[in-house]
């Protein structure tokens, strides 16, 4: 199966659907992986890192791919690039996304990651809501610390503890 990882087009989105480490696992499982040129740059993954693990860099990750992995749902003309019988996995915001009917009319299967069960099960390690909320919370503390003009009282991190 060919798995395509296109560049994210949502303004401000700096994530990429797969890291070189993840791509290596997909290739080891027997899949072909194509990465759209520059797809990982905003997430600090250069094209050569993907090439080193066996991925092919392309100008169009949609062509020939049976499975598309994205962080955010495709919009507008991106949807038109999806061939019939393609499967796409992304965060779709399904309760507010007005373009979902287009996937069905093109015979495209869409899996909304944010609707995966959030229970103690095998799917828990794929729970994007908890993992992304955890990262957002961590980042918010770092941003607040950068803006705060004094030392935080008792800062505990993986690198150690700074007492007041």
State the predicted function of each range:
Residues 2-102, 106:
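An N-terminal-biased, well-structured beta-alpha scaffold segment characteristic
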Residues 2, 76-164:
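Glycine/serine-rich phosphate-binding loop and adjoining beta1-alpha1 elements at the start
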